[in-house]
């Protein structure tokens, strides 16, 4: 699974309240949520992301309250993947379960510049930035299968169909 696109960078400790503020949690429409993703840091983020972007961030991306809407809003906004030095565990699982690739890369914000164009091999974790190849942690096994299906619900539907035949 190869993903590519331009980079938008954020720092450390981007919590779920920044990704999608609590006042929007009563809404369920992914496209509505997308309009408010990262709003506290950049009210125009959703316009930039709509072209298809890769977020590069620092440590503990997605920390804070367990909020599935964070992954849903990012994906709906046009975020193709998130590369970070580390992730909050619950965000990591929510991202995979919603079909949003998340790649762990040491020193991510030092290695990749804003507006760089990156190409990511999700399975191996290799990230091509210009002529440089960076080695992140890839996604394999069932997590990769869930991503390839488009998320946990699509994966379960697929498995149900396979088991019926």
UniProtKB/Swiss-Prot annotation:
This is 3-isopropylmalate dehydratase small subunit. Keywords: Amino-acid biosynthesis, Branched-chain amino acid biosynthesis, Leucine biosynthesis, Lyase. GO terms for biological process: L-leucine biosynthetic process. Its EC number is 4.2.1.33. Pathway: Amino-acid biosynthesis; L-leucine biosynthesis; L-leucine from 3-methyl-2-oxobutanoate: step 2/4. HAMAP family: LeuD_type2. The keyword Lyase applies. Pfam families: Aconitase_C. It comes from Saccharolobus solfataricus (strain ATCC 35092 / DSM 1617 / JCM 11322 / P2) (Sulfolobus solfataricus).
